[in-house]
Amino acid sequence: MDAFDVIKTPIVSEKTMKLIEEENRLVFYVERKATKADIRAAIKELFDAEVADINTSITPKGKKKAYITLKSEYNAGEVAASLGIY
């Protein structure tokens, strides 16, 4: 699966901004069929960042969210800034 097909869009809200600042986490809507391995590879390819942990959930509307924790040597704020959301 192509990295641009896996990662759909970042989620920007007060909660996600707090996660970026305090927990070094990013939140994206992802392709519903994407596995955690697909998401990990897409983050590595698109942002050159190593992933420490991924949690996923499917919303009642059927969209899949990925909560991505980056390793401590990478800054989620810098990745968010490169996306123009921070």
Swiss-Prot record:
The entry's keywords: Ribonucleoprotein, Ribosomal protein, RNA-binding, rRNA-binding
GO cellular component: ribonucleoprotein complex; ribosome
Residue pairs linked by disulfide bridges in the UniProt entry: none
A biological-process GO annotation: translation
Pfam families: Ribosomal_L23 (PF00276)
GO molecular function: rRNA binding; structural constituent of ribosome
Subunit structure: Part of the 50S ribosomal subunit. Contacts protein L29.
Task performed by this protein: Binds to 23S rRNA. One of the proteins that surrounds the polypeptide exit tunnel on the outside of the ribosome.
Family: Belongs to the universal ribosomal protein uL23 family.
Name of the featured protein: Large ribosomal subunit protein uL23
